[in-house]
Amino acid sequence: MHFYIGTLLAIALFKINKLIYYHYEVSHCSGKGDKMKTFNIASIPGDGIGKETVSAGRQVLNTVCDVHDGLRMEYLDLDWSCEYYLKNGRMMPEDGLEVLRSCDAIFLGAVGFPGVPDHVSLWGLLLPIRRTFRQYINLRPVKLLPGVITPLANRKPEDIDFLVVRENNEGEYSNMGGRLYQGTDQEIVVQNTVFTRYGVERVIRYAFDLAVKTGRQQVTSATKSNGINFTMPFWDEVFAEVGKTYPAITRNQYHIDALCARFVTHPQDFDVVVGSNLFGDILTDLGPAIAGSIGIAPSANIDPTKEYPSMFEPVHGSAPDIAGKGIANPMGQIWCGAMMLDHLGFADCGELVMQALTETLAAGMTTADVGGRSNTREVTEAVCSRIRMLAGTVA
């Protein structure tokens, strides 16, 4: 009952804030004296190191707000997690999606906890958010940053710098299928893949638009039409149709197995890569691995229309084995904050965070997972300090 009343009050306050600030224009990080813009952010630390990384990410975002008098963030703290599931039998309350609907964005840490199967957190929290709010784009940058060591030999930062666009709402992860004759030697299991023309076309078009927006020259499609004889040929057809409307952008296509190999052997060949839900999932983990560490990789679940809140989460898991030790790498979460700022219309502020993050890494201020000796707090404070210096205000 107390939670329900609190939820109603939170929603009311959020809506009041939106009415107050609706008429304000979005300013830029380089401009002082602009009118204030307030964003309401749902903060979901989740499990394990998520509590530490979200705290670090918020510290960096608050520093950006401190140096920019036209930007403010207010947080709605939500304890939804696998631990919440163990206590309540569900990953979030019944009205959880309505709570999130009132927010401008969702800042998520990591979910996962011993004793709770991964499919529980996926289907109980992440997928309902992605699908209810039409976050049909999962965007993950793959970039080798200065100071980070790649497992690939003789590769420099300019060799690994591309974007992976994953279809996030349908495809192979559709909840359709079933099992018959369970436990017998005649058991039958069927998992259906669902592609729609609308869904495939919009994600591919997003990839081409992204190439144009970021000044990249080519879009590469992940397929497997030599073995999957209905959905993948359809995907290829739509890719070709959409691609023809972007004559200045080169189209490439690889089967997923060959594409994975090429990520390793020729990462410099890619600008924007687009794939279905499953293939994109595979590539968006492989990409950060070749860039040095999943621990610094960000992820954005985006509704490009901005009708609904988008969700920003690092690629890394909850890492319960190091939770609470203060050694978690906060860079992935901080990078997520930069992507969130860009999505909310403060691209200059996102670039400021990325410059501070990059300079911090280049200076060797890193955690042990990428070869450093610093802890979570030290890395976070170093990024915040650089933001202040870059913005011309030393605290």
What is the meaning of each model-derived region?
Residues 85-190, 278-280:
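N-terminal glycine-rich phosphate/adenylate-binding segment common to multiple enzyme folds
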Residues 42-56, 184-256:
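Glycine-rich phosphate/diphosphate-binding loop of Rossmann-like nucleotide-binding domains
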Residues 70-93:
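N-terminal beta-loop-helix "entrance" segment that forms/cooperates
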Residues 47-50, 104, 165, 207, ...:
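Buried hydrophobic positions in well-ordered alpha/beta secondary-structure cores of metabolic enzymes
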Residues 37-75:
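N-terminal phosphate-binding or glycine-rich loops at protein starts, especially the Walker A/P-loop
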Residues 82-84, 262-365:
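Glycine-rich phosphate/nucleotide-binding loop
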Residues 85-98, 251-270:
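A structured beta-alpha segment of the ubiquitous adenosine-cofactor-binding alpha/beta core
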Residues 13-35:
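Short, Lys/Arg-enriched N-terminal segments with co-localized hydrophobic residues
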